[in-house]
Amino acid sequence: KGSPISRFIQDDLASRHMDYEGKEVEQGGAWGYRHQFNIADSGYGSRGPRVHNDRAGEVGRTLNVKDVDLQRIFGHEGVRIVHLSGLIAALSPETGEFCLEIARAAKKHGTSISFDLNHRASFWENREEELRQIFHEIASASDILVGNEEDFQLCLGIEGPEAGGKDLAANIDSFKVMINRAKEAFPKADVFATTLRQVVSTNAHLWGAIMAEGANWHVVEPREIPVLDRIGGGDGFVGGMLYAILRGWDPEKWIQFGWASGALATTFLTDYAQPADEEQVWSIWK
């Protein structure tokens, strides 16, 4: 509350046509709460990318459902899909409970739940048992589950292919086996998706995706994309896929638009993309 950095963040969100709501937390002086920030080197050529997160005293750790009107959001406004990130669920015990309560409220009101596992090793250290229980409950309530091979193995204990493996195009079937295991473990979900990323160099990746929708499989074979900054590609995929679902397109287009949105995000130095229109995204797919 009253922080110029908070004001900057609010203005930045507004510039992207994103609304927010939540309690304004008193900073508590110079040594109180603050906003986390990332120090990121995108890399170039032979220099690989590196990221450092500074989260000491992060105000986001205080998220609490008491500060959000869940009845209004789910009961009156009729949210169609609520998206949860494993990064937030693992940030602190408070945010883990926050995500659980959001999932429970969404399930109660018949709102679809999307859950991107987003494993972060530093968040899980010495908290594996606690977080595994939280992630299992959220995943059990979810309609859409997203994660790469490492996420499914470390967050949910679903055996899969080697993380960061090579020759992904030749190992599509091993990813399908992993997704089938996830389908058996979490039968409520009807959409499972994973991205495929093979690093050729800092500025060139092989990028693909696999999605199971009911009994149907949709695969985008890995193909080379130019990369300015890899950060945000996975989130771009999820955002594009959810957008396509909300638009009511055929399932085949969900994964195509998601793939293209992720590819678009890697052409920006920011960790998100702001496409001018749908055509700009589709032009990347085509």
Residues covered by each model-derived region:
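Conserved N-terminal subdomain of the carbohydrate kinase-like
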Residues: 1-86, 281-286
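Conserved post-catalytic alpha-helical subdomain immediately downstream of the catalytic base
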Residues: 202, 218-286
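A short helix->loop->beta-strand "cap" motif at the edges of active sites that frequently abuts
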Residues: 107-112, 186-190
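Active-site beta-loop-alpha junctions enriched in small/polar residues
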Residues: 56, 87, 118-122, 150, ...
